[in-house]
Amino acid sequence: MSITKDQIIEAVAAMSVMDVVELISAMEEKFGVSAAAAVAVAAGPVEAAEEKTEFDVILKAAGANKVAVIKAVRGATGLGLKEAKDLVESAPAALKEGVSKDDAEALKKALEEAGAEVEVK
């Protein structure tokens, strides 16, 4: 009869820390692997799970069609004509800060369709 995974886990759980270290070293030698590589691979998904939830939309440049960009900025921000024009002419400038990813991507798409150069941070 073969040993189950649960039996192995119980046996390892009952071992002292020094015994576990020796077991890991023996497994590294037996299979020609390093536990450090496994730790680095395991750490990768943890970083991916910490996804950013708030984004800033930055107008980098107005582009050739400044009037269309001003209209898009007015529609997205609710600013008046003069304020939107001043914002577009002062590029690079932050249009919106702390917005969701979906809102940031939608705003970026609308401004790029109007001819602006936009960055989402």
UniProtKB/Swiss-Prot annotation:
Q: Which residues carry this modification: N-acetylserine?
A: 2
- Fetch the SUPFAM superfamilies from UniProt: ClpS-like (SSF54736), Ribosomal protein L7/12, oligomerisation (N-terminal) domain (SSF48300)
Q: Tell me one GO molecular function of this protein.
A: mRNA binding
Q: What result follows from mutating residue 85 to A?
A: EF-Tu-binding and EF-Tu-promoted GTP hydrolysis reduced
Q: Which GO terms describe its cellular component?
A: cytoplasm; cytosol; cytosolic large ribosomal subunit; large ribosomal subunit
- The intrachain disulfides are none
**According to the UniProt entry, which residues carry N6-methyllysine?**
82
Q: What is the effect of changing residue 66 to A?
A: EF-Tu-binding and EF-Tu-promoted GTP hydrolysis reduced
Q: According to its UniProt record, how is this protein modified after translation?
A: Acetylation of Ser-2 converts L12 to L7.
Q: How does it assemble?
A: Homodimer. Part of the 50S ribosomal subunit; present in 4 copies per ribosome. L7/L12 forms dimers with an elongated shape. Two dimers associate with a copy of L10 to form part of the ribosomal stalk (called L8). The ribosomal stalk helps the ribosome interact with GTP-bound translation factors. Forms a pentameric L10(L12)2(L12)2 complex, where L10 forms an elongated spine to which 2 L12 dimers bind in a sequential fashion.
Q: What is this protein called?
A: Large ribosomal subunit protein bL12
Q: Which gene encodes it?
A: rplL
